[in-house]
A protein has these predicted regions:
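Thiamine diphosphate
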Residues: 1-171
Length: 172
């Protein structure tokens, strides 16, 4: 519901990623279910399975004007985000080097951690690596109750934010 509320609040908010606009699916954990029907294909749309392309395009789109916010389903699982690291570094460098003057207002959502019996490639925690990049916020709700406020703050902030969603919170 937080994603929908933020899209209603700011008409310059876009969300895109893998399986975002596939009917009633709403990505792997149904977080964006029904959003394309409400906000249209101009604001909620699919991306190819190419994590570097997803993040790089979000970075470029967010530069068009300061009010634009882009929420990215960066990879269906954090484990698959590694190909996007070069583009993430570009987001962080631009923000850091310009002291915030060039702010890619991008929130990258990643499902992180275990608890689904997914094995090696569906259960990794990558936040230790992500926190080493200057100019990027890395946040993760500890409890389901924290998720809405933290996501809202991430989406309204200037500069790039990685929002890591613990899989254990999805059904809490």
């Amino acid at each position: 519901e937080t994603l929908k509320a933020e899209l209603r609040e700011n008409p310059d908010t876009y969300i895109w990623g893998q399986d975002m606009a596939n009917g009633e699916k709403g990505v792997i954990f149904n977080v964006s279910k029904g959003m394309q029907q409400e906000f249209g294909p101009e604001r909620v749309f699919n991306a190819p399975i190419a994590e570097d392309f997803i993040v790089g395009t979000a970075n470029g789109l967010s530069r068009f004007k300061k009010e634009i916010r882009v929420v990215v389903e960066g990879a269906e699982f954090a484990d698959y985000f590694w190909p996007a690291m070069e583009q993430l570094v570009e987001c962080s460098h631009d923000y850091w080097r310009s002291n915030g003057a060039f702010a890619p207002n991008v929130t990258i959502r990643l499902a992180s951690g275990g608890y689904i019996g997914g094995g090696l490639y569906h259960s990794q925690n990558i936040e230790g690596t992500l926190t080493t990049f200057p100019g990027i916020r890395v946040v993760s709700p500890a409890f389901a109750d924290d998720a809405a406020g933290l996501l809202r703050t991430s989406m309204r902030s200037e500069g790039p934010t990685l929002y890591l969603e613990p899989k254990a919170c999805y059904n809490a």
